[in-house]
Amino acid sequence: MWSLLLCGLSIALPLSVTADGCKDIFMKNEILSASQPFAFNCTFPPITSGEVSVTWYKNSSKIPVSKIIQSRIHQDETWILFLPMEWGDSGVYQCVIKGRDSCHRIHVNLTVFEKHWCDTSIGGLPNLSDEYKQILHLGKDDSLTCHLHFPKSCVLGPIKWYKDCNEIKGERFTVLETRLLVSNVSAEDRGNYACQAILTHSGKQYEVLNGITVSITERAGYGGSVPKIIYPKNHSIEVQLGTTLIVDCNVTDTKDNTNLRCWRVNNTLVDDYYDESKRIREGVETHVSFREHNLYTVNITFLEVKMEDYGLPFMCHAGVSTAYIILQLPAPDFRAYLIGGLIALVAVAVSVVYIYNIFKIDIVLWYRSAFHSTETIVDGKLYDAYVLYPKPHKESQRHAVDALVLNILPEVLERQCGYKLFIFGRDEFPGQAVANVIDENVKLCRRLIVIVVPESLGFGLLKNLSEEQIAVYSALIQDGMKVILIELEKIEDYTVMPESIQYIKQKHGAIRWHGDFTEQSQCMKTKFWKTVRYHMPPRRCRPFPPVQLLQHTPCYRTAGPELGSRRKKCTLTTG
């Protein structure tokens, strides 16, 4: 928006509403020189700070200005761009700003004429866009500003400065971006200056030349006015290491000021301090004109924040006013770490529980095999399990039950795993009352194994004090014994089973036999036997040497009031 600072007259219009419902904000008069590029940005904070649409029109035409970039006059985002200005471009242009519920309009009155900075006989220098009055302060270090503001589609080359038609050279003059720094201003520095640059747009080049009339004054300022830095406010900014950061320095100052606005670090201009790496650069100054003051913005860009930048004050200077920012690492977000840790912990816990549920039986059996002792458990019990089984009426079921109970169970649990079982019909004492024998031996067992078949009346001792009733009553009521329920075949309906069996099924579940009474089914490492062993008391399995199955001769006991008074005689012979 370099044209905003040219010698134009801003005439404020009373806020009025036209027939189309748009409010007129103000009119801007611009006196321009032909044959030069010109751009005007339609901006009016805070109206244009939100989501709005901007459309340019010429005079009262209802046809918008073209947005085709090849057109000499076209709209570029919020700008209207002339490449270049011509004599016939004079007139009033309208910028319509439409928001969701609002409509505002800015008028720009352009006057184009031919004007030369130097005598035309010299040649070589193009026509000026206009003159702008600036002031240097005698005996001080001061600066002149070349107001060249165009949209991002325009690329400006290096700026050259002239005084009285001669290029400026010397140690007292330094070109910094769009500014000419003048050290130790003297009376000879007054005169006519010009700044020249090459503008490139869509592959075409144009020359831009601004004329500046410079006067010298001994006053320190204008009415004692001091620039006001709105932002930054001497504060810290949290920024992650390695990120890109852009910070604006916003300054309000009088329209006729000549204050230098820049960023410094360690009392050195940022561009000079990082001249080699160019990692941190100062941006081009822009400004917005208001009725009584200008709002200037000059930013600093960190292409990549490094550790050396933290804790270092980056100073924004505007005349005698200064303000700084200090970069610092963001404080650790403990809440994020805590939430992440909890999520990870829950995920691990769920995974462990899931894996344990899948491999629970193998894990428990491995632990018992690795760490449990093979010594006899001293708990007053003689047997690891009491085996309770039915007496089916069907011959096939009776044969299957006998094979499982009298052959396979002893082979796997007793011989391979070292458990000691009490099997009614194999280990009872002849001549003793059934109820007493069962009641006494159930109390000497650590587990109760109940084998069921679909034939609910298959239990031959279901009447009165039957074996099943005594064993289940003792296991569930008196001793709190753990019960292992084995289904010889799939049982569809447990409601026809005795209530005690229904209770066991509901409380402990059931293990279904999948074997076929072959040698393969007699391996303790099959899934069925692993499940049975999991429910049995802990014991380290130690395989016995391969011997023939033993024929068990019933043991004779003499019952007494004390367990220690019992005597047992056993005769074991090989079959």
Curated annotation (Swiss-Prot):
Per its UniProt entry, which superkingdom is the organism in? Answer: Eukaryota
Task: Tell me where it resides.
Answer: Membrane
Where in the body, by tissue, does this protein show up? Expressed in synovial fibroblasts and articular chondrocytes. Expressed in keratinocytes and monocyte-derived dendritic cells. Expressed in monocytes and myeloid dendritic cells; at protein level.
List all disulphide bridges recorded for this chain: 42-95, 146-195, 249-316
Q: Which InterPro entries match?
A: Ig-like_dom (IPR007110), Ig-like_dom_sf (IPR036179), Ig-like_fold (IPR013783), Ig_sub (IPR003599), IL-1_rcpt_fam (IPR015621), IL-1_rcpt_I-typ (IPR004076), IL-1_rcpt_I/II-typ (IPR004074), TIR_dom (IPR000157)
Which residues get glycosylated? Answer: 41, 59, 109, 127, 184, 234, 250, 266, 299
- Protein name, as recorded: Interleukin-1 receptor-like 2
Which SUPFAM superfamilies does the entry mention?
A: Immunoglobulin (SSF48726), Toll/Interleukin receptor TIR domain (SSF52200)
- Annotated Ig-like C2-type domain ranges read 20-111, 126-211, 222-318
Q: Which organism is it from?
A: Homo sapiens (Human)
Domain (TIR) spans 381-536
Q: Identify the Pfam families for this entry.
A: Ig_2, TIR
Its function? Answer: Receptor for interleukin-36 (IL36A, IL36B and IL36G). After binding to interleukin-36 associates with the coreceptor IL1RAP to form the interleukin-36 receptor complex which mediates interleukin-36-dependent activation of NF-kappa-B, MAPK and other pathways. The IL-36 signaling system is thought to be present in epithelial barriers and to take part in local inflammatory response; it is similar to the IL-1 system. Seems to be involved in skin inflammatory response by induction of the IL-23/IL-17/IL-22 pathway.
Q: What is known of its domains?
A: The TIR domain mediates NAD(+) hydrolase (NADase) activity. Self-association of TIR domains is required for NADase activity.
EC number from the UniProt entry: 3.2.2.6
Name the family the entry cites.
Belongs to the interleukin-1 receptor family.
